[in-house]
Amino acid sequence: MMIRDLGKLEFEAALAIQEQLAAGVAAGTSPETLLLLEHPPVYTIGRGGCRENVLDPGIRVVEANRGGDVTFHGPGQLVGYPVIDLGRRGRDLHRYLRILEELLINVAAEFGVAARREPGRTGIWTDGGKLASIGVGVRRWVTMHGFALNVTNELAPFRSINPCGIVACPITSLSAILGRPVPLGDVRRSVAGRFPFLLDERLPFLETAEPAP
């Protein structure tokens, strides 16, 4: 698997990179890739999102071909976009989502934060609120989009929306919980070191896999 650090990149530019990679992965000409980056401030909404969850009519919201509702991305938030060939890994989207949650729970624990799943919801949570959101798109059994882990980012912008479609949803970050800045680079390295091994353990490549339709 290739891991690429894109630094800080506009949402639309990152989407174009994902689409190019996804086409290559589906065709068997590109390796699976984990993109790690930050976005300048931007609100995005998934395919099934409800515009009523945008509480401030003055904000610009970008539509994204992923699951989930409306969320906010900004500097200090680690965004991960794994471009993964689920067609070669058993075509189990539910398990893939649980892997992303497990990854983020383990990363949070490395920094001394206890995070967990919430029944019936996607993402990870703490006693102080939601720590990370997950929204995935799949085309020809190749994944796009992924997760956003709050590290040092401002939390006030989340007040302009119902995050992930949840009314009065408290949002927190690693730094807010710990009461000190958490270096984003350290979190990035933890994610990059853990993800390939966790994915191969939980969703290994099949010896024979159907080609993408």
UniProtKB/Swiss-Prot annotation:
One Pfam family per UniProt: LplA-B_cat
EC main group: transferase
SUPFAM superfamilies according to UniProt: Class II aaRS and biotin synthetases (SSF55681)
GO molecular function: lipoyl(octanoyl) transferase activity
Gene Ontology CC terms, in alphabetical order: cytoplasm
Subcellular localization: Cytoplasm
The keyword Transmembrane helix appears for this protein: no
EC number: 2.3.1.181
Note: In the reaction, the free carboxyl group of octanoic acid is attached via an amide linkage to the epsilon-amino group of a specific lysine residue of lipoyl domains of lipoate-dependent enzymes.
Family statement: Belongs to the LipB family.
Protein name (Swiss-Prot/TrEMBL): Octanoyltransferase
Organism per entry: Geobacter metallireducens (strain ATCC 53774 / DSM 7210 / GS-15)
